[in-house]
A protein has these predicted regions:
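An extracytoplasmic/periplasmic, membrane-proximal ligand-sensing/linker region
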Residues: 77-86, 91-102, 285-356
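Short beta-strand-to-loop elements that line the ligand-binding cleft
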Residues: 114-121, 137-139, 222-231, 270-273
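Secretory targeting and sorting signals
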Residues: 1-31
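Bilobed "Venus flytrap"/periplasmic-binding protein-like clamshell domains
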Residues: 85-108, 120, 143, 166-237, ...
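Short beta-strand->loop
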Residues: 155-169, 222-225, 258-277
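Secreted/surface-exposed cysteine- and glycine-rich disulfide frameworks
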Residues: 32-43
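Extracellular disulfide-bonded cysteine-rich modules/repeats
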Residues: 49-57
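A ligand-binding cleft/hinge motif common to bilobed small-molecule-binding domains
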Residues: 139-153, 212-216, 240-241, 245-266
Length: 356
């Protein structure tokens, strides 16, 4: 074979081999740069990990950032095998259990302790559960919280419910409602000789403040027939059914919740009395829990149990439809026991045996 032809063939083979080599050898994709603690991340990345970092949303700063998992400073020594969340009954048990699902899930996630929700059939049952140490975290009414403390519950009010993120302290009202068609009841004094629905003997807006209002009008409990409905919703529904001539209820239950659910037509009712401002309800935690666990629960309730955080965690699609514990609650703001001294003063004014 001529030398030149041989050289051309050798060059062709070398070229083909080089081409095949470049195809066969994969080009390594350049790795994405690792996230650094404190750097910004996005809403779509929340709760996702990059190495040892997690994309976290802060309701305080309203920023998404990569955060390193804190080194465990707790041994979890003497921690309970489970946590129990409870609440005084404002509605039926099934509805309340559903409403507290996200709350329970977040407490369980942040503490790592299996968490369940219970709702007793009356306020006394919830108070007794926390006095006996069978309930760890309880959402009380102001009066039932005062009663629990007075009866020996080792608890601390760590947060009170607020309707918006910008509300420092919230208040609510007690209403007395009657059917519009009932022309005999147009004011608080008109309950004489009538069947009156209260909620529970340990309810703030469903008993204590109404009782104080009646006494201020000079009306004694012997001058009307008391019916304890067992829930704020049940009080209004009993008026609707004609079981009671009038009933006491907290404002948002009547103004928002019952109409939203189609259970009443507000136009069929009239509000014949409103109380003064009542400090919003507290979330109380057992002080005899291990201190490190107590602090985790407190931090979680104040920073992560709110509509803004629930949306960022993917538990809600938006704040407008998000439920924390009830539709009217955005979340919780720090509170102290002294905030409920007004409730204690109302108790003193009524001289009611229920206050003991």
């Amino acid at each position: 074979m001529p030398r030149q032809l041989l050289l051309r063939r050798i060059r062709r083979v070398v070229a083909i081999a080089a081409l095949l080599g470049s195809v066969a050898t994969p080009v390594l994709a350049q790795a994405a740069p690792a996230a650094k603690a404190g750097e910004s991340c996005s809403k779509s990345q929340v709760n996702k990990k990059s190495g040892s970092l997690t994309c976290t949303y802060s309701a305080k700063t309203k920023n998404y950032t990569w955060v390193a998992a804190a080194a465990s400073t707790t041994s979890k020594k003497n921690w309970p095998s489970k946590l129990v969340v409870a609440a005084v009954p404002s509605e039926n048990v099934a509805t309340m259990t559903l409403r507290y699902k996200n709350f329970v899930d977040v407490i369980q996630k942040e503490t790592g302790v299996p968490t369940t929700f219970i709702s007793a059939t009356d306020y006394a049952g919830v108070i007794e559960a926390q006095v006996a140490g069978r309930a760890d975290i309880v959402f009380y009414g102001p009066f039932s919280y005062v009663l629990a403390k007075a009866r020996g519950a080792k608890i601390e009010a760590i947060g009170a419910s607020v309707p918006t993120a910008t509300t420092a302290q919230g208040y609510y009202l007690s209403y007395l409602v009657s059917k519009k068609s009932n022309t005999s009841i147009n004011a608080l004094k008109d309950v004489k000789g009538k069947n009156v629905c209260f909620v529970d003997a340990a309810s703030t807006s469903g008993f204590l403040y109404p009782t104080a209002g009646l006494l201020k009008e000079g009306i004694q409990s012997t001058e009307y027939s008391s019916v304890f409905a067992g829930g704020h919703d049940k009080s209004v529904l009993a008026v609707q059914a004609g079981t009671c001539d009038a009933g006491f209820v907290y404002d948002d239950m009547f103004d928002i919740l019952l109409p939203q659910r189609g259970l009443i037509n507000a136009a069929d009712f009239k509000v014949v009395w409103k109380s003064g401002q009542i400090p919003n309800s507290p979330m109380a935690v057992r002080k005899d829990l291990p201190s490190d666990l107590f602090e985790i629960i407190k931090k979680t309730i104040l920073e992560k149990i709110n509509k803004t955080s629930f949306v960022s965690m993917g538990l809600c699609t938006n704040e407008a439809t998000c439920n924390v514990i009830e539709d009217a609650t955005w979340g919780f703001k720090s509170v102290t026991d002294a905030r409920y001294d007004d409730v204690r003063q109302v108790c003193e004014a009524t001289k009611s045996s229920r206050c003991r």
